Amino acid sequence: LVLLTHIHSDHFNPRTARALSKERPALRWGCCEWMVGPLLEAGVDKRRVDVISPYNSDDAALYKGLAVVRPEFIPHNVPNCAWHIFDGKEHLFYATDTGTLEGIEAKSYDLYMIEANHTRADLEARMEAKRAAGEFSYEWAAAQNHLSKEQAEEWLYQQMGPNSQYIFLHQHQGKGG
């Protein structure tokens, strides 16, 4: 099972999708409507694509023997979703590439995999250094489209139960890091 979130090249590679589809023809692809076209263009068999709506919380896909999955729309600069995954015993929440998780509920899940792209102080320092050097700064857009570590921690504190765990994803790597 491959769950897709959005079209950006660091999350979806058509050549990889094509290769996976050929090497594993029984593989299922779970996605929202905005990823169907790119999957089909990559050569994935439409009979293997499960389209799940992120706008209806009752819409979920059951993958027998594996998990129940449900997407939830999250804001980004292209259509994007987070995934709620339940394997019969444990709940997982997965979200990257969003400026906010405000309004998203995932109370007391077992594992949270969410981005913590930057710290606010680091982002501001990079913006100021680029301004001073007269360079283009993409950092403002990054702040709108990616969770800061502070935002991620605040959301986690509101959601986590006593046994919950988390993994930070999509962390900014500077030059040489």
Where are these regions (language model features)?
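Conserved N-terminal glycine/acidic-rich loop preference
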Residues: 7-12, 39-64
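Core dinuclear metal-dependent hydrolase active-site scaffold
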Residues: 52-111, 121
